[in-house]
């Protein structure tokens, strides 16, 4: 376990030494903030027009235009940029030979690099949690359990994306190729649920294959 944590820490250091990791956190936070404020503004407008209001917790976080749905629809765009160099960088630089010849198991290398992206994914969830805290002080009866379940679901989805990205990174020595191939696979798994909806058999198959639900 110590070797896994050391590899994860080293990978996180490499990740945060580059501007990509910080830039993605900022973009992710701004995107979530814009979605959050737009929903609140729409609800305030509906209240002023005396329109019937729905349960604010679900509208704010889980509606068709909710915060969690917006994050789910765009999360696959972030992960390829994070995972593209996990193993392809080692292969292109030749350091993979040193890793394989060192007293470290291949499974420890894989788990260590995967753990680094899991930790980064948790950081993105922490950013979303800030908006949940803001909603907690703005909404009288926020459905906390419902919101926590949504955060957990997004975290697990990010971990699944990370596993796919790590696998694609192991197939090539070019980071750009790894990023593009990961993006293609994740996009396919996200949009495959829209294929063949007029046919029961195809609809059932694409529903189960679709990673975004």
Model-derived regions: residue spans:
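Transmembrane helix boundary and interhelical loop/hinge segments in multi-pass membrane proteins
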Residues: 81-100, 114
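Terminal transmembrane helical anchor/hairpin motif
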Residues: 39-62, 181-213
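Hydrophobic alpha-helical transmembrane segments
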Residues: 1-78, 82-85
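Alpha-helix N-cap/start motif
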Residues: 106-107, 175
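Hydrophobic/aromatic residues in alpha-helical transmembrane segments
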Residues: 79-83, 131, 163-164, 188
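Pore- or pathway-lining transmembrane helices of multi-pass membrane proteins that form conduits
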Residues: 20-28, 175-190
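Secretory targeting signals
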Residues: 34-37, 54-73, 112-175
